[in-house]
């Protein structure tokens, strides 16, 4: 599947690709279109005041390779010459990067746009399937990622290429359905009166859900962090934490199923980010898939749609690297999202 591409859409190598999340930042360098990526240690965004400082000290100072092009995936909308990141204090200023760091070309995409590019670029062993049939080769796909926030994107196949469809799906309304839900939801923290997907299906959402369960049960919470809640839920040492994971899996299944119906995603639903990998055993226990398929009158359709957990930490970099190597494989608009050195 190849689309016609002009020189304006290609990238000059070496190319630095970066996945900038709310907590972690990952980078690698492609020396040319055929080379294996040169990887660097994962960075904590809180350890650096700016993204420029992080790139200079953790990347450029550690290699003799000077990238000519940069492709970044960031958690947040790409709008204007100063790009604020969601859940992180960094601000991406492409013009300043070109002036100060020696780059010729900087492109900034949405982080889940990169995840969408990855789902048709990863190897099979980088994913674990939870139910459904094998995916249809050129069918629409959906990526859903609970992590620091909740990312959502689609991936649609045209006649010539894959088209990522990023959005802000993590901020849709999510509501109660069962009697137990109605006991818990009054205690879930709201944003201007709304319970959004991100208020439950994220790291902080996991804690919100746990606190809601404790409030519904009229007990004092004893676990403080999402990590503590996850650990206690997985080993069964805390009943409320165990229910938190079960309901998290259920609510994630409901939302994933809704998105699968919206996109008619016979190419599959892909779960990315650190949380699905960490709670993989809970996702495979049954509640997730049951909620995913419970979409009458379309249960038969839902039974066939595969769900895959992306287990590879560098998935977004894989997607960005695929775009850098073969941009003709994808239709990605860079208008207003690409900056070049003036000559």
UniProtKB/Swiss-Prot annotation:
Domain of life: Bacteria
Keywords for the protein's UniProt record, in alphabetical order: ATP-binding, Cytoplasm, Glycolysis, Kinase, Nucleotide-binding, Transferase
Molecular function per GO: ATP binding; D-glucose binding; glucokinase activity
SUPFAM superfamilies according to UniProt: Actin-like ATPase domain
Cysteine disulfide partners in this protein: none
Keyword check for Cytoplasm: yes
Main location: cytoplasm
One GO cellular component, as annotated: cytosol
Cellular localisation: Cytoplasm
EC number annotated for this UniProt entry: 2.7.1.2
PANTHER family: GLUCOKINASE (PTHR47690:SF1)
UniProt family annotation: Belongs to the bacterial glucokinase family.
NCBIfam families: glk, PRK00292.1-4
HAMAP family to which the protein is assigned, alphabetical: Glucokinase
Stated name of the protein: Glucokinase
Originating species: Brucella melitensis biotype 1 (strain ATCC 23456 / CCUG 17765 / NCTC 10094 / 16M)
